[in-house]
Regions:
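Extracytoplasmic/periplasmic, Sec-exported soluble proteins
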Residues: 10, 14, 29, 33, ...
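Extracellular/periplasmic bilobal clamshell ligand-binding domains
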Residues: 127-168
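Solvent-exposed, polar/charged alpha-helical surfaces in well-ordered, non-transmembrane soluble domains
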Residues: 20-23, 39, 43, 95-99, ...
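Extracytoplasmic ligand-binding site segments that recognize negatively charged/polar headgroups
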Residues: 1-45
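Loop/turn elements at helix/coil->beta-strand transitions in domains of secreted/extracellular proteins
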Residues: 27, 44-47, 64-66, 92-94
Length: 168
């Protein structure tokens, strides 16, 4: 929703333009109210998906002619949060796992899966990046915007309050 909002004149703080965009899709008969997957795309049920580029990258392996479009004016990023529970049975093992995830090897595994590693710039500079996997990523232009947790919460609240009347 945040991507649709930013692409249509909204912002990380104002997702109303995103809800309006989906309302316009509904009015035009182009909104399909199902969760799209590679299977629904193959079947022709959902010819367009709004999803993270790393998920779309995986569809290209299964769907002939699959294309990924990242709007230049609305590149939105997000991080996965990692945590170690101090009361875990083996917190040292959990810390080692975290170290592995953020090691060059772990980051290159994220990259091979189509995700953009958080340490990508540093790994490119040091020559530790898997250059073939990096080259396979969808091209983006512009600087990604990263919504804060507060912005995501407010966006979710707005969508919860306004979605059904927009697409019903």
């Amino acid at each position: 929703m945040i991507l649709a909002a930013v692409a249509n004149g909204g912002s990380l703080d104002d997702v109303s333009k995103g809800v309006d965009f989906f309302h316009q899709l509904k009015q035009a008969g182009n909104y399909v109210p199902i969760i799209g997957t590679a299977a629904t795309v193959k079947a022709g049920t959902t010819p367009v998906l709004f999803e993270w580029d790393y998920l779309s990258t995986s569809h290209g392996k299964d769907i002939s002619g699959w294309k990924i479009f990242v709007p230049a004016n609305a590149t939105i990023g997000g991080y996965y949060a990692q945590a170690v529970n101090k009361d875990a049975p083996h917190p040292a093992s959990a810390r080692l796992w975290e170290e592995y995830l953020y090691s060059d090897e772990g980051q290159n595994l994220w990259l091979k899966g189509g995700a953009r590693p958080v340490r990508q710039a540093a790994m490119e500079k040091s020559g530790k990046i898997d250059s073939a996997a990096a080259a396979a990523l969808p091209k983006i232009t512009g600087t990604p915007q990263f919504p804060t947790q507060d912005q995501q919460t407010k966006a979710g609240d707005y969508v919860a309050a306004n979605w059904s009347k927009a697409v019903s």
